């Protein structure tokens, strides 16, 4: 079976500059609208949205590979790193802290990307993780690497990565491309990110975790490319929503050796960035509608604890699943009083059950109330 790294022009990727520039202009137009929308927020609100988006993207980055992590732990870890006050401090989670460290290093550390830094990211992914781990952590693989697909009892080899003897040399070329300032002038940030991510996945330098690191590399390139802008768009979140297309595109491009053209890949990634910008604006709009609705609630129908908690839920100062225990702790009231408050808000349609049972039972703010009532709450 042929692979892209067998092409005689590897790794000289090519793409249609006209098409790429056209869709990139669309992205810049949308980004301008997004930046304008977020510019009206105060510093704390901007930081809160930034934390929420980062947490969403970190969880999505793992979920793309069917890896799971506790969202509340990630949100708590990011909040602490960015000095965002939390209504309830969640206990530290070593795995969430490691994933957070990698993600923040990718977007905030604009120093050149090195082999040592990538190996450090690899250690962060696996050292505190439960379950199966690759034999080698924090260094390149030393054996053949296959990408497999299971169909019932059948196992199909979808892709064979670059031979391990060539990995170190291939990675030096990739890192040189990423760190070369001339390439930043030659390619727009999304095109450059697309090239680097696909190139890395094609090499597949590690025994596991390559997809997660490829998306961290994407974040690094985008953050460096847009260093003067607010980072509110999250590529991994959009990839997760379109995961089948993502894997199909990678497979189509890497499992052949006739062409080095990656125009479709760059177009797709740019479209994901556009959708991510739109999603950020939509999330902001819903939150503002929700906050507006809360400000117009009749205080005579709710006690002070209920009003206080509703505002914390609406403006994001409390995030995650609300439990009876958390309510009692935050409001310094008895469990019985907390339960009565919560049940009252459920009856009013403001809280909805999480669907969990036993100790995991909890509640969330009803996401529909802002849409339903926000426009009439002015």
Please provide the spans of the model-predicted regions:
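FIC/Doc superfamily catalytic core
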Residues: 1-378
């Amino acid at each position: 079976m042929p692979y892209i790294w067998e092409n005689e022009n590897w790794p000289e990727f090519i793409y249609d500059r006209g098409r790429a520039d056209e869709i990139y202009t669309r992205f810049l137009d949308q980004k301008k609208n997004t930046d304008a929308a977020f510019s009206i927020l105060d510093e704390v609100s901007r930081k809160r949205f930034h934390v929420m988006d980062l947490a969403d993207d970190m969880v999505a980055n793992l979920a793309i590979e069917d890896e799971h992590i506790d969202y509340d732990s990630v949100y708590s870890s990011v909040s602490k790193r960015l000095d965002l006050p939390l209504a309830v401090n969640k206990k530290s989670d070593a795995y969430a802290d490691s994933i957070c460290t990698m993600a923040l290093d990718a977007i905030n550390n604009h120093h050149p990307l090195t082999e040592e830094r990538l190996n450090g990211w690899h250690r962060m992914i696996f050292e505190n993780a439960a379950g199966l781990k690759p034999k080698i952590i924090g260094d390149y693989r030393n054996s053949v690497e296959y990408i497999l697909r299971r169909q019932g009892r059948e196992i199909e080899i979808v892709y064979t990565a670059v031979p391990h003897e060539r990995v170190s040399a291939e990675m030096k070329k990739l890192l040189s491309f990423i760190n070369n300032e001339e390439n930043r002038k030659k390619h727009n940030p999304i095109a450059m990110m697309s090239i680097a991510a696909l190139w890395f996945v094609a090499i597949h330098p590690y025994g596991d975790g390559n997809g997660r690191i490829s998306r961290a590399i994407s974040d690094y390139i985008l953050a460096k490319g847009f260093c003067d802008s607010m980072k509110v768009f999250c590529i991994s979140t959009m990839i997760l929503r379109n995961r089948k297309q993502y894997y199909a595109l990678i497979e189509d491009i890497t499992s052949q050796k006739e062409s080095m053209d990656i125009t479709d890949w760059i177009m797709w990634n740019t479209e994901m960035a556009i959708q991510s910008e739109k999603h950020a604006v939509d999330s902001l709009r819903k939150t503002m509608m929700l906050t507006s609705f809360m400000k117009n609630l009749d205080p005579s129908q709710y006690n002070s604890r209920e009003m206080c908690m509703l505002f914390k839920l609406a403006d994001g100062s409390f995030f995650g699943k609300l439990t009876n225990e958390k309510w009692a702790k935050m409001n310094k009231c008895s469990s019985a009083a907390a339960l009565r408050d919560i049940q009252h808000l459920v009856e009013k349609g403001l809280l909805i059950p999480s669907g969990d049972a036993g100790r995991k039972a909890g509640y969330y703010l009803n996401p529909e109330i802002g849409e339903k009532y926000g426009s009439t709450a002015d």
